[in-house]
Amino acid sequence: MPTRKVIKLCPIKEELKIMKIRQARNINVIAMLNNLLIDNITNKQIIGVPLPKDMIAKFFIEWNFSGKDAYIDFLSQYNGLFFPEGLLLEASAHDIEMEVETFYDLCGRLERYWDITKDNVDIPKKFTMSHIPIADDAAGNEYWINLITGEVVFIEVEYGIPEGVHIVADSFSTFYSALRPMH
C-alpha cells in the first residue's frame, strides 16, 4: 500500500508570519554581505570601546523595533565606526544624495548627542522620545532610528524637524545594506 503524505494546512496568518521570518533572514544575509564589502574596501576606524552584547541589549530592552537585533549585533561588533572617505547611501527611495561618515558608539556619542538634542527647544520632545541618533555625515546631518517602527530617518540640519526629515530605510539592516564605498 503506498504511503500518503500528510500536508499540514497552515492558516493564512501563520503562512504570512513564516514568509516575514524568511524575508527578515534574507535581509540579514544581504546586510552581512554588504558588511563584508564595506569592511574589505573602505578605510574605517572603530571609535568606541568594545561592549558585551548583553550590556547593549539592556540599553535597548524597553524598545522592540524592527531591525533591533541587527543594530545590536552591529554595535556589539563595532560600537562606533568612522569612515574618513565616507559611505554613500544608494538613492532608491529618496531624491537627495546622502553620505555616512560616522556611526555613533554606545556609551559615548550616541547618548551624548541624544541628550543634547533632548535639551534643544527647537526639536519636538515627541521626536526625541521616539527616536535615537545612530550616525551622521560630514556636514553634521544625522541619521536616527525610530524606536517604535525601526525606520531610519535622515535629518537635514538646515531644515530641522519636521521639514528636514526623510525616511531612508525601513530598518537598520536595510539602511546598512544600502551603503556603498564613496570611491
Residue map of PLM features:
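A surface-exposed partner-binding patch
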Residues: 6, 10-139
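Local beta-strand/beta-hairpin segments that build beta-sheet-rich folds
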Residues: 134, 164-169
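Glycine-rich, aromatic-bearing surface loops/beta-hairpins
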Residues: 160-165, 173-181
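Intrinsically disordered, low-complexity regulatory segments enriched in Ser/Thr/Pro
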Residues: 150-160
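Short, solvent-exposed coil/turn segments at beta-strand boundaries
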Residues: 129, 147-152
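Pocket-edge structural micro-motifs
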Residues: 136, 147, 156
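Cys/His-rich short segments
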Residues: 1
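Broad, structure-driven detector of short, well-ordered beta-strand segments within folded domains
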Residues: 141-147
